[in-house]
Structures are given as C-alpha cells and as structure tokens.
Amino acid sequence: MPVRPFQVKVPEAELTDLRRRIAATRWPARERVTDRSQGVQLGTLRELARYWTNEYDWRKCETRLNALPQFTTEIDGVDIHFIHVRSRQDNALPLIMTHGWPGSVIELLETVGPLTDPTSHGGNPNDAFHLVLPSLPGYGFSGEPTEPGWESGRIARAWATLMDRLGYTRYVAQGGDVGAAVTDAMGRQAPKGLLGIHINLLVASIGLEDKLPAKSEQERAAHGAVKTFTTDGFGYFLEQATRPQTIGYSLLDSPVGLAAWLLDHDTDSYYKISRAFVDGEPVGNLTRDNIIDNITLYWLTGTGASAAQWYWETGRAQAAARAAGQASSSGLGQGRLHDVPRRDLRCPAQLGRDGLPRPRLLQRDRQGRPLRRLGRTGALLRRSAGRIPATTLMVPLSSALPGRGFDADSGH
C-alpha cells in the first residue's frame, strides 16, 4: 500500500460552525457542591467556552502540525495518519510513539525536537531517534474502523506493519495510556525488528480486599484509594467500555459537551486544567491553547465517538481472554498514581503525584538512552519463547532515576 503525504486543511466554514455551536450551548444550572464530585464545574466550562469562541486560534495548531512531515497509509482496511520525522543522525534509532485517550498526536509534538535533534536540547548525536507518531484508529486524522475487533493487539500488529512499510528493521516502541496498552501488546507479540518497549502507564490486577493479608494499615488504605477511584472516578471508562455509541451522539453534536467529557477523566488533571481557565495559571504546558488544541482536533475530525470504541473493544477482548483461561491485565485507569498495595506490586515505589499523560518522560530519561541501549543489546531482552520480558519493560524507565520524569508541576 502507498504512503501518501498529508496536510491539515480545515475549511473556514467548519470553524465558523464550531463557534456558532458553542454560542448556542444550553447551559445547565450550577453544580450543587463546591468540588467536582458532580462533574465538570460550570465556571470552568463557561470560561473555556468563552476563550474558545473569542480568543482561540485553531490555525496556529494547524500550522504547527503542517510544519512536520505527515502521511497516511492504509493498513488492514483503515487509513492511518502518522507524523514521521527522521533525525539528521544516520545512526538514529527508529521509535514509534503512541498517544492515549483523551489525547492525540498533539500531546507528542513537544518531544519531536529533543528526540530527533538532541544536540540542540542538551544531548549528543548518539541520543537521536527517528520518530513515527501514529494517530490511533478512530482518532484524529486516522480513519474509523467499520468493523469490530480493533483492540490493542490488532493495533499493535498494524504498527508493526507500519514500521515494516517504512523500511525499519530494528526499532523500539513507547506509549502512554491507550498507547501503553498498544505498546505492551507489541512487546508480547514481539514482531520481527522490535527491540524493546517503554511505557508511562503501569497496569496491574489488584486482588480482592478480603483476600489481602492484614500486613499494615497503609496497605489497606492504599487498596481503599484504588477502590475509591474504580467506584467514583471511573465513569468515563465504564460508559465508553459499555455504551460508546450512546455517549457518541452527544460528543458529535455539542462541542461544549465534548469538552466536558474530555476534561472529566480524573480529578488531578481536571483541577490543573481548571486552574488554566479559571485562575489563568497554567501548570507546565497545560495552557489554554494546548488544552483546546486537543479538544478542537476531536471536534473537527468528528472522532469523539470512534475514539471511545477502544474501551469497548478492550473490554470484550479481556472478557474473551478470561473465558479462555488466559491472563489479562486491567489498568488502574487514568488519574493520579495510586499508592498500590505492595503485596500486588513488585515495584511499589511511588512514581509521582498525578497521572497526566507524560510523553516527555522518555526525553527526560537521559534523552531516551535506556531505549537506545535496547537498540544495541536487544538480543538480550528476548526469552526462549521470543517475547520481550514484560516484567522488565512494563516499569517506566524513569522509576530508576529519582527526581526525574514524573514531575507534578510540569504538565504533560
């Protein structure tokens, strides 16, 4: 299949329609509580809508995207959009990075310079990567699958096809959130040429509380924190995993409704986003424009519903695996990094204060050198079964570097 150049060109009429729809929003009454326990607060969303309508300029984001080499290619019947930036260094290691939900390739743009041109960012030529940044199927400018079955494993196989199509015979993979699940699947599949993986989302299956040994109050408090999230902070996951089509009608009809849905996925990042709009105090790169760039991309591409489908696909795939007696992992979801009971986790050290997507973790890991070392010693990472050892690579490399990587005040 051919690889075709791609440029973002949004008609002005679509931007005019977006502003009209925002202005026509039917607002509910203010929440009855002082926190966000009932959902996105009215004050935050009204200020976001005001800025979106009166001050925000999508063309800046469009220009930023079009400054990078973008392409599309058909894989398994779906058009896949991707950014492909080759380093000037001939010995650069190819790296495919995958975003998550509610994100997009926009959240990866700030990594392009440091990873492809490390000498300009405090590194040396040997730190360089050739970057491939695909949009997940049903996200951004990628096409929407027309049949079920596009869970992480199928996407992982598509990514291996993409890297092969680009001529890469040795490469590494990185991902966060949904991208972490896809990257983990790549590690388990171990396609020819994949040397190693790096993820910035830990996943684990936590035992039932009544089965836990009574070791300490801290252990049980940690289990309680996880339970609170899975019962009170898991709404987005449950809806998208069970009824993505139902919520999809609202996400494609109301830009403000879409914004609220994308903001309401975890408490810590929500409050940071709220600070950017209500207080005018962005945290790290969580600026008003960066936040709305991502929301606008979802709106203009009409992918609010199709992006949610991954959760449904994943739930069905996990259920099928359990029914077949196969192991399946379940994530703690997005949000803060929970203090997980140590009985259930072999790397129990707290890795940070929140769970914001952090693609720059790889950049901060000594300019990605741990992954480059995999490029030189990848043969050592393969078991006799030919699989990459997930127990080694499931842990973010930053966990070995105290004070590096997860920075609560640095934004994405």
What do these predicted ranges mean?
Residues M1-T16, R21-I22, R26, G193-Y298:
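Alpha/beta-hydrolase
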Residues E14-R86, N91, N290, W299-A321:
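Non-catalytic accessory segments flanking enzyme active sites
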Residues K60, H121-G123, L136-W150, D184, ...:
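Glycine-rich "HGGG/HGxG" loop immediately N-terminal to the catalytic nucleophile
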Residues A92-G100:
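Short beta-strand element of the alpha/beta-hydrolase
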Residues W101-G113:
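The serine-hydrolase catalytic nucleophile loop
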Residues P114, P118-S120, T169-K215:
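Conserved hydrolase catalytic core segment
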Residues G153-Y171:
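Conserved acidic catalytic loop of the alpha/beta-hydrolase fold
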Residues Q240-P396:
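C-terminal subdomain of alpha/beta-hydrolase-fold enzymes, centered on the catalytic histidine
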